[in-house]
Amino acid sequence: MMDIFNALDISASGMYAQRIRMNTVASNLANYESFKSDGTPFNRLVPVFEAVENLEDPSEVYVNVREIREVPGFKLIYDPENPNADERGYVRLPNIEPVKEMVDMITAVRSYEANLKAFSLTKEIFERTFEAWK
């Protein structure tokens, strides 16, 4: 049976995962037009999550960040004045779409808030139960 602390741990793991997601989106937006030191475009980063079962109770599942994956690819624009332009005048830009990143950010924030609400409600139930036992 799930105890109160496991419920708090599950909500906390969800908040952790969404915080990683928000940080990844922020990094993508910050590097929207960035290049690596070798002149290649910054690759979009995407967190990869995995479900981890509680070994003591398989009905309890936590969220874990398995890795932060680079998504290869780029956009081509014509800008012959750019120092990173190729011999035809095209520049490879990062494969980051700001609108998609903002949608991902909004989704991550809402998921974080839902986990925070679940955490807060669980804590409140615990506090009220403890008060009733006094």
Swiss-Prot record:
PROSITE patterns cross-referenced by the UniProt entry: FLAGELLA_BB_ROD
Domain of life: Bacteria
Localisation per UniProt entry: Bacterial flagellum basal body
Keyword entries, A-Z: Bacterial flagellum
Name of the featured protein: Flagellar basal-body rod protein FlgC
Chief place where the protein resides: other
Gene name linked to the record: flgC
Biological process terms in GO annotation: bacterial-type flagellum-dependent swarming motility
PANTHER family reported for this sequence: FLAGELLAR BASAL-BODY ROD PROTEIN FLGC, FLAGELLAR PROTEIN
Signal sequence segment: none
Keyword match Nucleotidyltransferase: no
Species annotation: Aquifex aeolicus (strain VF5)
UniProt record similarity statement: Belongs to the flagella basal body rod proteins family.
Gene Ontology cellular-component annotations: bacterial-type flagellum; bacterial-type flagellum basal body, rod
Pfam families, alphabetized: Flg_bb_rod, Flg_bbr_C
Binding partners and assembly: The basal body constitutes a major portion of the flagellar organelle and consists of four rings (L,P,S, and M) mounted on a central rod. The rod consists of about 26 subunits of FlgG in the distal portion, and FlgB, FlgC and FlgF are thought to build up the proximal portion of the rod with about 6 subunits each.
